[in-house]
Swiss-Prot record:
Active site: K161 (proton acceptor)
Catalysis performed (reactions): uridine(2552) in 23S rRNA + S-adenosyl-L-methionine = 2'-O-methyluridine(2552) in 23S rRNA + S-adenosyl-L-homocysteine + H(+)
Origin species: Ectopseudomonas mendocina (strain ymp) (Pseudomonas mendocina)
UniProt-recorded name of the protein: Ribosomal RNA large subunit methyltransferase E
InterPro entries recorded: RNA_methyltr_RlmE, RNA_MeTrfase_FtsJ_dom, rRNA-MeTfrase_E, SAM-dependent_MTases_sf
Family: Belongs to the class I-like SAM-binding methyltransferase superfamily. RNA methyltransferase RlmE family.
Length: 207
């Protein structure tokens, strides 16, 4: 079957993308690594020895960046519905984050030790119908915030991909109620046409 013009356009954009080329050169699994690297350069959210949870981790771009910074004294628990090739010293849990059993497995892997940082690059499979996609995206954001509220230590941080649209303002207020400082980030490596932004919440106030 011949490729559609849309898919041909996407392929051209993908292979012409400088961040895709950089990822191949630098040994990262995806261009998404540079989004976290940009945020790290500006905000220094990752430090050696931290305990971090990475949601929506596959194919592993953010986990690669995180594991390199936190080092062998840090701890990283990653999860995704998709398979992810192993990364040294990373605990990976495969499953649907919206499934209570998978959520429980993540909590079990974290254990009793409080977490310093929760990061999430999760997004639903986009249909292109904004009225359907936005609620699914916000639902994932709600679940990630719920997890963060359960596992973060007081003073911990939370970084999540979020899309502008219905439910954004309410969610932003929810996060503000639990953290000292909330900022929005749009990395240069995030495509201009994408509605995605990253919400960075710092200073978890505790339950």
């Amino acid at each position: 079957m011949a490729r559609s013009k849309t898919s041909q356009r996407w392929l051209k954009e993908h292979f012409d993308d400088p961040y895709v080329k950089m990822a191949q050169k630098d040994g990262y699994r995806s261009r998404a690594s540079y989004k976290l690297l940009e945020i790290q350069e500006k905000d220094r959210i990752l430090r050696p020895g931290m305990t971090v949870v990475d949601l929506g981790a596959a194919p592993g771009g953010w986990s690669q960046v995180t594991s390199r910074v936190i080092g062998d004294k840090g701890r990283l628990i990653a999860s995704d519905i998709l398979e992810m090739d192993s990364i040294p010293d990373v605990t990976f849990i495969q499953g649907d984050f919206t499934d209570d059993a998978v959520f429980a497995r993540i909590l079990e892997a974290i254990g009793e030790n409080p977490v310093d940082l929760v990061i999430s690059d999760m997004a639903p499979n986009m249909s292109g119908v904004r009225a359907a996609d936005q609620p699914r995206a916000m639902y994932l954001c709600e679940l990630a915030l719920d997890l963060a509220g359960r596992v973060l230590r007081p003073g911990g941080d939370f970084l999540i991909k979020i899309f502008q649209g219905e439910g954004f303002d309410t969610y932003h207020r929810q996060v503000r109620d639990s953290f000292d400082k909330v900022q929005m980030r749009k990395p240069l490596s995030s495509r201009d046409r994408s509605r995605e932004q990253y919400l960075l919440a710092r200073g978890f106030r505790g339950v």
